[in-house]
Amino acid sequence: FDPSKENLTVIPSVTNEQVDAIIEKIRQAKRPVLNAGNGIRIAGAFDVFRRVADKLGIPVVTGWNSIDLMEDEHLLYTGRAGNMGDRAGNFAVQNSDLLFSVGSRLSIRQVNYDWPAWAKHAFVIMNDIDAEELKKPSLHVEMPVWADAKDLLEKLESRLNEKLADGEVLFKGDEWRQVCEKWKKDYPVVQPKHYEQKSPANVYAFIKEESRRLNEGQITVVGNGSACVVGGHGYVIKKGQRFISNSAIASMGYDLPAAIGACVANKRYCKETGEKEQDIICVTGDGSIQMNLQELQTIIHHQYPIKIFLINNGGYHSIRQTQNNYFGKPLIGIGKDSGDLSFPDMAKLAPAYGFPFIRIDSNDALGEGIEKALSINGPVICEVMVDMDQKFEPKAASKPMPDGSMVSAPLEDLAPFLPEEELKSIMRWSSEE
């Protein structure tokens, strides 16, 4: 098969000159950051990415669809960048003087609506398999690399092996690594305030308590709304885990079919490799699960080991927040607080399908309830009743100005907004030579 004869685009191979230029730019940088996108997974380049990241020795941020590329405890992992990212990841990007992005198209979700302010002090090296993505007006790309991510990373690894001794890293800037590590420690997504209210439970507290109890290598599939956003914000990622979402499409109802697909694929993989099969975790919401509710019977019929954690926030919480932020009362088409629609009682639906059922209605009950659900042999539904007033945070947001106008704040300035002096202190790194 010859793609050129079919008039198909042939992706160019990465040249030695390109690789050497990238290495030299990283070597010269004072505040480099590696932005790791989901194209790395798609290219089958996960293993080589991990080796290259270790050899480069620069802080790593992940994107909206790629949070499982690096575990939270990895020394180089800084955070999650973008308008649904965290503070530490965005502080690193916004203070960087070089951004090396691999396998990410750097969509508006990654660069924000105030895209001229994105990584404005950085020399941007961007890799993507689609040449058109490198030309978008919402980006400044000083060194475009049109290539397959695996080809780029394999050639980088080969060149780094030639240039570096065993155990040596390319970037020698310990101070910058320590600064990024401190941001990660000082600005966690899940905070003590999320545990203060006892009942109902807080969704951020739930996400942390659930995810920290999972095993290395375990697979989580999430629905949309709170499951995707809060999960993407606050999930504790461990080594070898997968976090699967359809965030770019964001259609409700993805959760159950995707969890079934992940379960079947995982069974086949474990059979072929001899690895121990683990339960699949499905985190979804009271709105999303209704879109493909019939798949509960598929799970029961085949006794697929899927643990369903159902976030009950009384309706469509993403829409609730949008209406409250921009329009106010009365709310329309939300759930309990709009009064014009409602959802069935899962305590009655679950046994009708044959599921064991657990309900958690307070922060104090999170640990016991989650552990009970995880310990049950086979499928289970664990419903978590959460606060309807909890907003997604931190999050890119419009900022009110003194004249009453609204402007999109840059990525370093996520809502809830930090005190001005604190933010200035954090951003001082961007002006250092």
Region spans (language model):
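Conformationally flexible catalytic loops at phosphate/diphosphate-handling active centers
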Residues: 1-28, 189
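Anionic-ligand anchoring segments at beta-strand to alpha-helix junctions in alpha/beta enzyme folds, i.e.
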Residues: 14-15, 23-99, 213-257
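Short glycine-rich anion-binding loops that position phosphate/pyrophosphate groups of nucleotides
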Residues: 38-40, 65-67, 104-107, 225-227, ...
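A short, gly/pro- and small-residue-rich
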Residues: 51-56, 111-131, 240-241, 394-410
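Short internal beta-strands
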Residues: 58-64, 125-128, 306-312
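Glycine-rich, acidic loop regions that bind phosphate or pyrophosphate groups
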Residues: 66-179, 370, 374
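Thiamine diphosphate
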Residues: 83, 95, 134-137, 144-146, ...
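Active-site diphosphate/adenylate-binding microenvironment
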Residues: 179-273
